[in-house]
Amino acid sequence: MTIVELIVSREIDAVIIFESANVIAFADHDPINFGHLLIAPTFPYENFIDVPELVFIEINEVVRDLYRRLDSKFNPDGISFIQNNGKFNDLGHYHLHIFPRFDGDKFGWQSSNLGIQNINDLRKSLEGL
């Protein structure tokens, strides 16, 4: 069973913020900032592409609601979302991170420095997509 399934079945404890038959939202155990939440389907879909459309719609409705609630509670400078698939999905269960951002929080994007210097290089890299 995945961590999310264990939380849904109450086999492990979590700070649950929202739950329906299809979606659960709970506090991340290793948060980037206060208010860092995970939103996931209650069933074990592994990747983004596996989630049925109606469940995905509900997930996005929950994300929108939680965005408003996080914004109201924490008054952040911004709110970020992250979602990983394949070997970068460390839970083996589709989930989306949502967390408040604050100036100076030191969370950032590290450039891979691919060397794309102009629009033509960028266009060529995406040909056939």
Q: Can you describe what each PLM-predicted range is?
A:
Residues 1-129:
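HIT superfamily nucleotide-processing domains
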